[in-house]
Amino acid sequence: QFDAYNSKSKEDSSFIMFSKSNDQSLTWSEPLRISKHGGDCIDDDNTVEGAVPAIGPNGEIYVTWTGPMGLVFQKSLDGGSTWMESEIVLQEQFGGWSLEVPGIYRANGLPILKCDLSNGPNQGNLYLNWCDQKGGEDNTDSWIIKSTDGGVTWSDRIRVNQDGSNKHQFFTWMTIDQSSGYLYFVYYDRRNYDDTQTDVYLSASRDGGKTFVDTKISEKPFIPSAEMFFGDYLNIDAVDGQIRPIWPSMKDKKIKLHVALISEKGLKK
């Protein structure tokens, strides 16, 4: 929530609010502020935003977002009635969440939170995926941390993209196939080029985020233009071994949407 969007006044703040519906979205509960610490309203690195919820196997509600404190985490164990006294900081987000990537009008590195609800060995695991520039301003990467105890403790960060090229990987998004517990990530990737040519890659993890295998899924690269707003997110879903990443590409300042029809059986192992 913004007191006044784009306001530069120190009197205006941004916060994270929570509301829920018990009747299929017909009515909603009174919004409850769940971020103890706020940010500014400029819609930049010091703004609190990018909240993504995830539901645990026993109805736990988990939320992550980012802002001046870095990547933070909140949770409720009673359906959203009460929350932790304050959000906890999970990671520094190097370069902030509003990243500078050549050829991109605005490159968000906002976090994505998912929970394993499968019947597999990693049921209940929380996974947090985001992009930042820990490797330097010319080396954006996709990262993940995980929790196996409901967000009490978290692993060290692990890099999702396995190229080691010191190039940009950005606009990450992830999903979990709840039939298997496998993790899938989609992101833009420039590992193969020295300019702004951009491919799309998918990474898969079949061991709860310990190891990853990369696959290029775009047929050919495209060259974006920083003069044109390109959107803020990619997306991906996976059900019963069928994986559907979706992304935009750009040619001559015209945007096209793409979806890939991918089967787990056909991916590199």
Question: What would you call each of these model-derived segments?
Answer:
Residues 1-269:
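Extracellular, repeat-based ectodomains that mediate carbohydrate processing or recognition
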